[in-house]
Amino acid sequence: MVYSYTEKKRIRKDFGKRPQVLDIPYLLSIQIDSFQKFIKQDPEEPCGLEAAFRSVFPIKSYNGNAELQYIKYQLGEPTFDVKECQTRGATFSAPLRVRLCLIIYEREGLNNIIKNTKEQEVYMGEIPLMTNNGTFIINGIERVIVSQLHRSPGVFFDSDKGKTHSSGKVLYNARIIPYRGSWLDFEFDLKDNLFVRIDRRRKLPVTVILRALNYTTDQILNIFFNKVIYEIQNNTLYMHLIPERLRGETASFDIAVNGVIYVKKGRRIAAKHIRQLKKDKISKIEVPMDYIIGKVVIKDYFDKNTNIPIVTANTEISSDILHNLIRSGYESIETLFSNDLDYGNYISETLRIDATTNKFDALVEIYRVMRPGEPPTKEAAEYLFENLFFSEERYDLSSVGRMKFNRSLQRVQIEDLGTLKKDDIVDVIKKLIDIRNGKGEVDDIDHLGNRRIRSVGEMAENQFRIGLVRVERAVKERLSLGDLDVLTPQDLINAKPISAAVREFFTSSQLSQFMDQNNPLSEITHKRRISALGPGGLTRERAGFEVRDVHPTHYGRVCPIETPEGPNIGLINSLSVYARANKYGFLETPYRKVQNGVVSNDIHYLSAIEEGDFVIAQANTNLNSIGEFIDDLVTCRNKGESGLFKKDQVDYMDVSTQQIVSVAASLIPFLEHDDANRALMGANMQRQAVPVLCSEKPLVGTGMERAVAIDSGVTVVAKRGGVIKYVDASRIVIHVNKNETHTEESGIDIYQLTKYIRSNQNTCINQRPCVSLGELVEHGDVIADGPSTDLGELALGQNMRIAFMPWNGYNFEDSMLVSERVVQEDKFTSIHIQELTCVSRDTKLGPEEITADIPNVGETALSKLDESGIIYIGAEVIGGDILVGKVTPKGETQLTPEEKLLRAIFGEKASDVKDSSLRVPNGVCGTVIDVQIFTRDGINKDKRSLIIESEKLKQVKKDLSEELQIFESALFDRVCDVLMTSGIDKKKLFETSRNAWLDLVLSDPEKQYQLSQLTKQYFDLKRMFEKKLEIQHRKITQGDELAPGILKIVKVYLAVKRQIQPGDKMAGRHGNKGVISKINPIEDMPYDQHGIPVDIVLNPLGVPSRMNIGQILETHLGMAAKGIGDKINFMLQQHKEANQLRRFMQQAYNLGEGSRQHINLNSFSDIEILKLAKNLKKGMPIATPVFDGATEKEIKDLLKLSGLPSSGQITLFDGCTGEAFERQVTVGYMYMLKLNHLVDDKMHARSTGSYSLVTQQPLGGKAQFGGQRFGEMEVWALEAYGASYTLQEMLTVKSDDVNGRTKMYKNIVDGNHMMEPGMPESFNVLLKEIRSLAINIELED
C-alpha cells in the first residue's frame, strides 16, 4: 500500500479483513453536485436556472403583439469573498444578468410579422453562492440547506387497512401526485362505488371525470368490463362460454352438452371441470331463460321497427325487457361480465349514482366543486378542466413522476409527457379496480423507491421559478398596456420579486439552517442530513410510527442508527457513507457484481426500486482468493427479507461492511458490540464534542478519521505536490513540482491559514501547520490541522486511562471521577469566542453616540476604554464591565429651580442622555481579542476606526508584498536557470541586479523567447498585485452598507478559556455519558504496581444494563495500543538502532489473521522509521472498522505483545490508603469527549431581578436571569420538617409578596434582618380569577 507523506508520519494499524474495493466518496458531494447542477449552463440538457428560465420564457402579451424571449444568463463575480462576507454581515452572492430579446409583431392578415427586436442584458437580482465546503453565507452567518426526503411524484395505490370504518372493510385508493399541479385521488367507499377527488375537495363519482374526458356510457362499460354474449335460437338461450370465468361459481343448473353432464346443479365449479370443458372445446352451453334475468346490458338496444330504446346500457334485464328484445327480433344479447370473486361491477354501480349524462354536465359538476358559488359557463368549465391536468403551465409530473407513473402501470416506455393523458387516468382506474379484485398489491409508501431526495439545487430552482412566475404576470400586463415602441426588456423586468423569493428561501425556510459548527464531524453530518420535515413534507405531530421506522430499503442508503432522540426521531436521518442520489433523486448504494458465484470488482449503483429484483450477499461473506463464495449457502437479502440462498443464485454483494451506517456511526469502534439505542446516543454525542486546545488522535479508531477530517474542509490540503519553501503559523508556501506546473505560472502555491475565528457555536477555529521547512508533500496531503484534527485525522477528544470501579460513591449514576492531572495538563481545556455587538441608532430624539463620556460612571469602569469609548484589545474583562460606551438621548425633563441651581453650581454633565453601554454579560470573563467597527457610508469615522483601518491596510500591504516577494523569488530562479543554460557566468550574473537580468539579450532565439515570456510574467505579476492592493484598499476604506436607521456597529470578540470542572458533561463514543462529580487530587487516585494513576474512574454498573460492550473492548485494545507505544518509547530512550525499532513495529503491524493491511517497513528510510517511532511512542493508533473489527483473540495477542495480561485486568492500589483492591480491575484507554454542555453556560445566581407581570413571581431560566422554582414537592419537604418560618419566607418575601420584599430589601440595607410577610400577589390573582366566575370573595382583617 502506498502511503502519503502525512500518513507515513503515523500509520494506523488496520484490523479490517475485507478488502476495500471502493474508496470512500467525497462526503459533501450531495450538496456541491446539486448546487453545481443548479448554476450549470447547458442548453442541451437544461437544468437548474436554465430550466427555470426555459419553463417561463417566452412570455407573450395577451393580444399576441409582443413576446419576450430568453437567450442566456450569466453569473457575475461576488463583491466580497467568504471571509469578508462573514466579517461584514453580508451575503456571499453573485449578480445574475440575463440576456433577453423583446420581439414586437405586426399583424398582416392572419400572420404575425416581426416589426422590431430589442436585445438587452437585464439584472435579475443576486444568487447566493455555495462556498467550497457546501455552505452559504447569508447575512454573515454560515448556513446549510438540508436535503429533504419527500414523496416522489407519480401514482400510488394504497388502502386504509380497514381503519376507516368500524366494519373493518379495507377501502382502496389511488393518488396521482404531480411535481407541480392538482392532486387527483380515486377511492372506493363502503358500498364499493368508486369516487374521484381533485385537490382533496368534495368527492364525485369516478364516471364524472370519465365523461369529462368525452367517454360515453357504452365506451366506459366496454373499457372496464368484458362482455358475455347470449344467443336466442328457437326459444332456447345459449351462452358463449369462456371456461375460466366459471371458476368458483356454483352451478344453478346442470351444465350439459350433447347429453354429457359436466357439472351437476348445486355443485361448485372446480379446476377439473374447467379442464374438461377446455379439453372438449366447449364454446357454447344451453342455459335456462331466467339465467339472463338480472344481468346488465353493455350497450343500448332499440326497437328495430320504431327505433324506440328498449333498454339503455348499464340496465339490468328484467323478464319484460327480455320479452321485448325477443319480440323485436334480437338473436344475441351482450351483457357485462362480473362476479363476486374477482370481477366486481364497481364502475357499473358507480354509473348508476352518477347524475351526469354527457361531457358538459360532467364539466359543470367539476367546476362547481372547484369554484363553489361561481356560475358555470361552457367556456369557463372547459378552460378550468383543461388547465387542471392537461396544461404544461399548470401541471407537471416531471421526468421523475412520469418514470414512476409508467413503471407503476408496467409500461415499457419510461419517459413521456409531463401532463396527463386520457389513457393515464383510465389505466390508473383499471389498476385500482384490479387491486380491489385481488390482483396486484398496494404500494409501500415508506419504501425508498417511493421517496426521493430534494437537494439544495432543486429547492433553489423551485424558489427561483416562483419568483419568475410573479415577474411573468407583471410582464404580460406591461406588454399589453405599455407603448411597445418605447419599452425595453429592462423596463419590463422588475428583479425584486425574484430576489425576494430567493432571499426568503435562504433566510427563513425550515430547511435553511444555522450550521452546526461544533466540530468537523458536526459540519459534515449537518450537510449530509436528510429531513422528512419542511415545506411539502411531513409535520412531526402528524407523522406516525411507520414513517419513522427503519425500512429494509434504508440498507446502504439511510443510516439506521443516527437520528435525533425526541419528537424528530426517524424524521431526520443521515445519509449512509457510500450512498448517493441518482438523476431522479432516488438514493442509490453501490454493490459488487456477482457472476456465476464469482464476485467481481465491477461496481453497480442500485436504487431501492432496482434492488428488489436481485439477491444480494453481505459484505462479510467468506470468499476465497479468486473471489468465489466458500460456503454453498450464503446469507442474502431479497425483496426486503433475509435468508439463505445457493451461491449461484447471488447477483450482487455489498461493497463494504460500513456501507449500512452514516459517517458519525462509522467512527464508533466495535459498533457491532453496542446496543442500537446506545450507538444512536454515541453517534449524536460525537457531534457535540468541543474542540480542545491540543487535539489528540484516538488510539482506537475505525479508519474513517482521515476521510472525515479532509472532506470537512477544516484542514488545509495540498492542491499540488512540491517542497515546503516557507512555513509559519499563518502561511505555508509550497514550491510546486515541475511536472505539475504550467509554463505560464510561477509554480508557487500559497496557503493562508485561518487564525482564531469564532464558529457558529462560539468554539474556536484555528489552523496549525503540520509540516516543516524543506519537507516533500504530494497532492492531497494534509499540510495544516484545523480544530479537532491531529495530523490529518479527526480528533474529537482525548485518550484517557480509565478504570471501571466504584470510588466512594463519586461515580454513582453515571458520574465520573476525574484526576487533577487532566486539568493540570489542559487535556480538556477549550477556548470559546463570544461576539458581542453594540449598535448605534438614529432615534427620534437624536443619534445615539459611542463615547467614553458616560454619565454616572466612575473612572475605574472607564479605565479599559480608549478615547472613542471602545475597549482595548487584550483587556481582561469580567461580568458587568463596559465594552463599548454608548449614550442614548432621552426626553428633556422640566427641572425645579433648586435642581437648576445645583446644576449651575456643580455643572452635572449630560443630563439629557442615558447610559446604554454594551457590557459583558453576567458570569462571563475573558480577554478581548478583536474589535470590528462598521460605520455608515457618509459618516465621519472615529479615531479608533481610523486606527483599525490603518492597521488593516498595513497588514494587507505586508501580506501582499511578502507574497509578491515569494512569487518574484521563484520567477527569478527560473530566469536564472534560463540565463545560466545560455552560457552566462553565474558569478557575473549575481554581480548585476536581478531586474537587469530581464533586459539581457540572448543569442539563442528559443532562450530569448523563454526570457521574454518570463519578463512578461514578471510585469503581469506586478500589475496583478497592484490591482489587488487597490481593490483591498477600496474595500477597507469604503463605508459599510448598514440597515436603515443604524449609524455604527461595534463588534467585540471575547476569548473565554474553559477548563474542565465538576458539572461538565463528558462521554465516550458508545453512548456512555456522564457528569464530572469531582476533580480528585492525583495522589488520591487509584494507581497500578508501577505507580501510574488512572485519569478517570467509571462505574462498572453503567455497562451491563446499557449493553454497550464496545466500550470494554475499546478499553482493552486501547491498553494494548498504549503498551506497544510504551515499548517503542522505551526503545527510543535506550537509543536502540532503527532496525530494532523496524522489526518490533513490523511485528506489531503484522499481528492479526487475514488482515487487508500489508505494511513493509523495509521500504521506509531510517529517518522515516525514527519519525514514525516518535509519533507512535504515546501509543500505536489502531483502526477497527465497524462490523469488521479486531477479534477477541487479536486483542489478547496484542496485549501479550505489549507485555500486559491478556485478561485486560490489573491489580490497583487505593491512593488514599496504599492498599491493593481485593479484586483485579479493568484498566485501559478510552477515547473521551468533552461535550458542549458546560456547567459555566448553565449555572447562574440571582438575588433580585425581573418579575412576571401578572403573578409578580421571579422569571425562570438563565436567559431571563430567573430564579429557581420552589415547587409543590419542595413545599411538602419543608412541611415534613415543620420548618414553617422558612416556608413562609419562601412563599412570600422571596417570591411574590411585593410590599414584603421591598421592605425586606430596605431592612437588609439598614442592617435590620427582620421580615414582615404580607399577601402574596398570586393569591390576589386567584381572588380576581374567582371573581371573574361571579363569586365574590372578600378578606376579613
From Swiss-Prot:
It catalyses: RNA(n) + a ribonucleoside 5'-triphosphate = RNA(n+1) + diphosphate. DNA-dependent RNA polymerase catalyzes the transcription of DNA into RNA using the four ribonucleoside triphosphates as substrates. The keyword Cell division does not apply. The lineage of its organism: Bacteria, Pseudomonadati, Pseudomonadota, Gammaproteobacteria, Enterobacterales. GO terms for biological process: DNA-templated transcription. Keywords: DNA-directed RNA polymerase, Nucleotidyltransferase, Transcription, Transferase. One of its GO terms (molecular function) is DNA binding. This is DNA-directed RNA polymerase subunit beta. The RNAP catalytic core consists of 2 alpha, 1 beta, 1 beta' and 1 omega subunit. When a sigma factor is associated with the core the holoenzyme is formed, which can initiate transcription. Its EC number is 2.7.7.6. InterPro entries: DNA-dir_RNA_pol_bsu_ext_1_sf (IPR042107), DNA-dir_RNA_pol_bsu_external_1 (IPR019462), DNA-dir_RNA_pol_su2 (IPR015712), DNA-dir_RNAP_su2_dom (IPR007120), DNA-dir_RNAP_su2_hyb_sf (IPR037033), RNA_pol_bsu_bac (IPR010243), RNA_pol_bsu_CS (IPR007121), RNA_pol_bsu_protrusion (IPR007644). Pfam families: RNA_pol_Rpb2_1 (PF04563), RNA_pol_Rpb2_2 (PF04561), RNA_pol_Rpb2_3 (PF04565), RNA_pol_Rpb2_45 (PF10385), RNA_pol_Rpb2_6 (PF00562), RNA_pol_Rpb2_7 (PF04560). GO terms for cellular component: DNA-directed RNA polymerase complex. It comes from Blochmanniella pennsylvanica (strain BPEN). CDD domains: RNA_pol_B_RPB2 (cd00653). The keyword DNA-binding does not apply.
